[in-house]
Regions:
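Transmembrane beta-barrel wall of Gram-negative outer-membrane proteins
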Residues: 11, 93-176, 329
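Short, glycine-/polar-rich solvent-exposed loops and beta-turns at beta-strand/coil boundaries
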Residues: 7-11, 45, 411-415
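Residues embedded in well-ordered regular secondary structure
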Residues: 21-133, 307, 324
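A beta-strand signature from Gram-negative outer-membrane beta-barrel systems
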Residues: 1-30
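Acidic, glycine-rich flexible loop segments
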Residues: 67-89, 104, 185-216
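N-terminal plug
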Residues: 2-9, 39-43, 469
Length: 594
């Protein structure tokens, strides 16, 4: 039932994070500093220039083509007599250091009294890549660096004996720096440029390059191509107040909470260009070196600069709740009535997302042995058409704590043995967008010329047909499992099997509609997927004196099946995805020449 609590937003799972709160007995300060050195566990073994040149000649010979390098040129690679014209460059060592450094400083402060508690944490993290630093142009730093600073404060205020106020605020700054070419894509050049292609620089200081590899000099791309600097800022705040209503009836309480998230980002780019050249060298049969240098491109001493605002997101959430928990002898009953409203606004047009839900949750436990939990959620999305914005999401679960039965009292090694099962319905509107249910129009229709200058004017055109009967994606999920704790809770095991059917997935409607209609057909809610699997974990935690140790293992099995994606007619049955795994790769098997 946990996913059903989130209605139209719960089908893909929910991650709940509980942060630390303050203590009520004095002040506690913790300071942790971690310093790490990242080293290359294993580096690739690249062919040197002489080996590469021989391999290239062999490959050309196999295709019946003339050799690229003659004997004199091969000898020049071997001896290194002409390091600029017949170079031997180890691009890996020229661009990477042997180590990278990581710093992490974390300070936390916790304290307070019975009336007021606080918890504050400051977390600073910095990671410097093994890629080498630009030492030639001090106007920008291309060393790939990740820097993060997070400050969090949680407050608990006991306003009265029955009123508790909680507040939290988080500020986070993240900065990413690196070469404009890309910290990851530069490795494509390091791996792809042969050691014999060109030198790092020629004697005149111009970077090496060629008509084949262009400006793809890894050292130049790392140090002299400009840099990028991405800065992201996040501000999260939440406030809640809980009122104990035991004066009305024992176990009754009300709570209201509001939260705001503000996320923004900036992308700064510095552009720089450089010249590159190639000597186009050759060695004649008598050993004479002949060069015909060619220089390409231009040097740009003035840095180009862009600083666009990259992204913005504003999220707000309001929740009101009345809950009841009480014990009558062997009977424990509980319930909650919750209203939730969420709004997410992103930069751009038609990028807002709004959801609201009303849900009822009820629980019953008898003698701490048998429990039943039921949820009913009425959830809506602004993406859906008027009159059909809301759907119902029920769920139910049951558990039997076998270890609390009388016949288990003599089984002393077992501390907990629980069997549980659940079934529920949840939804997902994250793949929807605004006005899918409306006919769309564009400006790409037949046009005309008008006016003194006979300027062209485009006409209107019909876009995709609307999605008829648009609904949110549905997930029906059933689980069955057990939990075991034994030997004073040192041994713990969990096994859970699950089955899930995803339906009403948006897929193309064109495949089931004849092209004679003459217009682009929109999507339809006809996709169906199935999932089934098993999760299991086993762990042992114990101590010998003051030495604590633990060992564990986990296993997951997942089988997926495409039931329907509205696929078009295929000439051969093996081309259909139906019945195969979701995301399965398809291709031809190479069985050789015959």
């Amino acid at each position: 039932p946990a996913a059903a609590l989130y209605g139209m937003r719960g089908a893909n799972g929910v991650v709940l994070i509980t942060t630390k709160r303050g203590i009520s007995n004095g002040l506690k300060v913790n300071v942790d500093y971690n310093f790490g050195v990242n080293t290359q566990f294993r580096s690739p073994d690249f062919a040197d220039a002489y080996t590469y040149a021989n391999a290239l000649n062999t490959a050309l010979s196999g295709d019946g083509l003339p050799a690229r390098y003659n004997a004199q040129e091969l000898d020049a690679f071997r001896t290194g007599i002409y390091p600029y014209d017949y170079p031997n460059v180890d691009w890996w060592n020229e661009t990477l250091n042997n180590t990278g450094l990581t710093h992490n400083l974390k300070m936390s402060f916790s304290g307070g009294s019975d009336k007021f508690r606080f918890y504050t944490v400051v977390d600073y993290y910095r990671d410097r890549s093994m890629l080498k630093k630009n030492t030639e142009d001090t106007r920008f730093d291309t060393t790939p660096t990740d820097t993060r600073l997070t400050v969090r404060t949680n407050l608990d205020v006991k306003v009265t004996e029955s009123t508790l106020l909680k507040a939290g605020i988080v500020g986070r700054l993240k900065e990413l720096r690196g070469t404009r070419y890309g910290r990851n894509t530069i490795f494509n050049k390091i791996y792809g440029i042969p050691s014999a292609a060109f030198p790092i620089r020629y004697e005149n200081g111009i970077y090496g390059g060629s008509s084949v590899y262009g400006t793809g000099n890894p050292v130049a791309l790392l140090k002299d191509y400009g840099h990028i600097r991405n800065v992201y800022g996040t501000l999260l705040a939440d406030l809640s107040i809980r009122q104990d209503l035991s004066a009305l009836t024992k176990g009754l309480a009300a709570e209201a909470s509001v939260s705001f998230d503000n996320i923004g980002g900036m992308n700064e780019t510095t552009n720089k260009e450089y010249r590159y050249m190639n000597s186009n060298a050759s060695i004649t049969s008598d050993g004479t070196l002949v060069t015909t240098p060619a220089i390409y491109g231009t040097d740009s001493e003035t840095l180009g600069h862009t600083q666009p605002f990259e992204r913005l997101m504003l999220r707000s959430d309001f929740q009101a709740k009345v809950d009841y928990n009480r014990t009558f002898g062997k009977h424990q009953v509980g319930g909650a009535l919750i209203y939730d409203m969420q709004s997410v606004v992103k930069n751009g047009r038609n990028n807002s997302q709004k959801n609201q839900s009303v849900l009822v949750n009820a629980t019953y436990t008898y003698d701490n042995r048998y429990s039943l939990n039921a949820v009913f959620n009425r959830s809506g999305s602004a993406y859906l058409p008027d009159g059909d914005k809301y759907s119902n999401y029920p769920a139910v679960s049951a558990a039997w704590i076998v270890s609390n039965e009388a016949f288990m009292e003599k089984v002393t090694p077992i501390n907990l043995f629980k069997i549980r099962a659940s079934y529920g319905l949840s939804g997902w509107d994250g793949n929807l967008s605004h006005e899918l249910w409306r006919q769309s129009y564009g400006s790409g229709g037949a046009g005309y010329n008008f006016g003194v200058n006979a300027g062209g004017q485009s006409g209107g055109s019909e876009g995709d047909l609307p999605v008829i009967g648009l609904v949110a994606e549905k997930s029906q999920k059933a689980t069955f499992g057990f939990d075991l704790a034994a030997f004073d809770n040192r041994l713990n095991a969990t096994v859970e099997g699950f089955y899930e059917k995803r339906s009403d997935i948006l897929v193309s409607g064109a495949n089931s509609t004849s092209g004679i209609i003459g217009i682009t057909v929109g999507q339809v809610n006809e996709g169906i997927y199935k999932y089934k699997g098993l999760d299991a974990s086993l762990s042992w935690n114990d101590k010998i004196g003051d030495f604590h140790y633990g060992i564990g293992a986990s296993m997951s099995y997942l089988n997926t099946e495409v039931v329907n994606v509205n696929q078009a007619y295929q000439e051969y049955d093996y081309l259909y995805t139906k019945g195969n795994r979701i995301g399965q790769m398809y291709g031809l098997e190479a069985i050789g020449f015959f």
